[in-house]
Amino acid sequence: MFRLRFLPMKTGAGAGASASECKTTDDLTLVAASWRNSDSMPPGSSIVTSPGLAKVLTHAELGSCDAWKHAFRNKCKDHRYYEIIEETLEDAFEYHYLLLEDDSGNARAIQPVFFVRQNLVEGVPGKMSSIVDRVRKIFPHFLTMRVLMVGCAAGTGDLAACDERDETWVANALQASLSSYARQNKASLVVLKDFPATYRLELETFPIHGYARIPSMPMTRLPLPYNNWDEYFLTLSKATRKDLRRKFRKAERPPKIEMEVVSDIAPLVDEIHPLYLAVHERSPLKFETLTKGYFRTIGRRMPDRARFFIWRQLGKIVAFSFCLVCDDKIYDECIGLDYSVALDLHLYFYTLRDIISWALEHGLKYYYSNPLNYEPKLHLDCELVPLDLYVTHTNSLLNPIFRHFLKYLGPTRHDPVLQRFPNADQL
């Protein structure tokens, strides 16, 4: 499986901040020195495009850039989240930011991008995976490529327009600059990572210009037009209700499991992080690994959105779930389980019931869950939320061949459960 999960120009509408409000650092000498031995363009570089100019910024330069505060302002994962990701994730990502200016010098967007060396066959089952593993004992980089990714290293992608009315303009500006930027940085592929299908109209310029659009592993969504859990429970199939009752009875035996909800997990991070890693390591697909610093920081920098659900038995944390609450939606980002009791007590379902109950009590209308583990979500009447990958090879001669090859690497090909969802055709 291609593990990228993974993961008409509109001018004049809502022009962004003036480029003069985006000040670069006074002296790039020290910063540039650290880039001399890398494969990336130094900060301050620019790419001229037909819509305007794309400037490469560093994280340090974002603090003096007013446009950055406007990017993602109506998204659940706003600019704060991207800052946290760069500061706390330890994976081999090289983070950059493209300041997109129009011909008048107005900053219309600041789009996060990052470089990573990608395993092209991660998650592919059967003999092919075994063969590749043997070859990599001799050639470690076999079937891996340096990739320029557009989007979020720990989440779905969004267009970072300062004004949402400019999203089509931003898509055109990105399309005009990404391939050149990738080639200058010795990347073989450009990937728009995990963009929701709701962006297909704005992003149609990419397939028009040679990108392949393939389905990534989708999220799921559960509409919540109910007053409480019991009302929702009655809408499930008889077989599902019977199975859940059996699971809940086992979890509800003494000793009692108690739940707490907090926005700052920092005091408990040493307890919850091993539980997260236990689940993460069992996943057949891995991209980013969330760190203790990530959990500490996100609750303190995004207290308005971060919610940590904690379950204890006899005072010991046996499960936790990290969620983001935005408007009438709750996004279940990750879970941690103590596997010494989790399977026996069916804690996945127990925690899910508590989160949905909490969401209903707080008037939320949608529960979103991240990709994978689709079988239980199907029986809980969740629907798919399609995510797309837009992929191109930077070599124009190889790209047609690569596009043909991609259809055999698409991640959704290897999960038969997906086709059983009522809206699977939307993938």
Give the location of each predicted region.
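Intrinsically disordered, low-complexity segments enriched in serine/proline and basic residues
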Residues: 14-18
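Hydrophobic alpha-helix feature that most strongly marks membrane-spanning transmembrane helices
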Residues: 277-284, 299-303, 316, 322-323, ...
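Short C-terminal domain-edge/linker segments immediately following a structured domain
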Residues: 91, 129-131, 139-147, 221-225, ...
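Acidic/proline-rich low-complexity IDRs
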Residues: 3-6, 27-29, 56, 137, ...
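Active-site/acyl-donor-binding loops of N-acyltransferases
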Residues: 2-10, 22-51, 115-119, 156, ...
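A conserved beta-strand-loop-helix scaffold within acyl/acetyltransferase catalytic domains
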Residues: 49-130, 179-180, 188-343, 425-427
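Acyl-donor binding region in acyl/amide transferases
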Residues: 94-95, 102, 108, 115-213, ...
